[in-house]
Amino acid sequence: MTTRTPPSGWISRLAQGSLVKQILIGLVLGVLLALVSKPAAIAVGLLGTLFVGALKAVAPVLVLMLVMASIANHQHGQKTSIRPILFLYLLGTFSAALTAVLFSFVFPSTLHLTTAADSITPPSGIVEVLRGLLMSMVSNPIDALLNANYIGILVWAVGLGFALRHGNDTTKNLINDVSHAVTFIVKVVIRFAPLGIFGLVSSTLATTGFETLWGYAQLLLVLVGCMLLVALVINPLLVFWKIRRNPYPLVLTCLRESGVYAFFTRSSAANIPVNMALCEKLNLDRDTYSVSIPLGATINMAGAAITITVLTLAAVHTLNIPVDLPTALLLSVVASLCACGASGVAGGSLLLIPLACNMFGIPNDVAMQVVAVGFIIGVLQDSCETALNSSTDALFTAAACIAEDDQLAKNALRS
């Protein structure tokens, strides 16, 4: 009688190996392929498209099932940390906008306002942005899932979760089982990240390159420098204020395991499953992160606030419009509000720049030229913006959960 030999060990080693190291290998190979053969690099871009498509496909179902399951099984009296997380989201976004204002005054940038972008229609005012968000809340659930409308998905998931609290245990068990099944699919998709990053890097470098970015080197330095300051100084200060210990191990973990993915996928929605997996790895409260992560992907937009502020003030400096301190502070507030609505606007943060430009009386045709500049530098700007936005979702969720656990431990010692 013959016995079957186990499958080759290299497959299991790949499956169990360090995902971050594999992603770095994929990144290096992607750069090399783009340098050696552009046609081949463009061809393997399909791997990146498939990876991002898979993440985007599973994310809406994941959010619906996790939120519904966590609320349906929530026990009366069981505490979650949603309120402090929401406060951190808003404070972080406003702090990012203020930082961008300071950077823009210390390192003023100017633009070459020659490109037209008449085919793009931005929202006419902040009221329209807020109206769009409200309309997203009352979206048809099937339509919300098909179009990845996370505001609508959250509303339906919360509503169904509360309704199912009074359901049978069999129903709750079924929801939990489906939730675990979707989570398993997400883990499988994430294991293909090295191939996805390889394809994304290869095709991006082969099709766009970085030649067009050199003309906007100073503007990019201000944007990226501001985002780095927020990621490595401002956010750690907020986390330290919350957890009262060295924040950098947590900050660097979130940047490494969430920011790296988001940088290459350039999609907060696609990074929701990655953040969910990171929160599970950090052993955070499932009831909390299943709500806070998709909520953060919708309203926690520090990177968008920076983009709106820096590009608006670049236009202001180009046109020699004087700006006083109260106006700069008001711009920070407007940029923060615009950033929170960026997920509800096609084109994201760039198409909300005309709203901020309107504060300074900048005509719409000039504002749209600023938007066009944003699209030119978008290869790097959008990647950095998404990395900051998405990694901060996981960071603030972890900080609030850790602070809550510490408080519970202190209360237990006192009693």
Swiss-Prot record:
It is found in: Cell inner membrane. Pfam families: SDF (PF00375). PANTHER family: PROTON/GLUTAMATE-ASPARTATE SYMPORTER, SERINE_THREONINE TRANSPORTER SSTT. GO terms for cellular component: plasma membrane. The keyword Glycosyltransferase does not apply. One of its GO terms (biological process) is serine transport. Involved in the import of serine and threonine into the cell, with the concomitant import of sodium (symport system). It comes from the Bacteria. This is Serine/threonine transporter SstT. Keywords: Amino-acid transport, Cell inner membrane, Cell membrane, Membrane, Symport, Transmembrane, Transmembrane helix, Transport. It is a multi-pass membrane protein. Its main location: membrane. Signal peptide: none annotated. It catalyses: L-serine(in) + Na(+)(in) = L-serine(out) + Na(+)(out); L-threonine(in) + Na(+)(in) = L-threonine(out) + Na(+)(out). The gene is sstT. Coiled coil: none annotated. GO terms for molecular function: neutral L-amino acid:sodium symporter activity. Belongs to the dicarboxylate/amino acid:cation symporter (DAACS) (TC 2.A.23) family. SUPFAM superfamilies: Proton glutamate symport protein. The chain crosses the membrane at residues 23-43, 47-67, 85-105, 144-164, 181-201, 220-240, 293-313, 333-353.
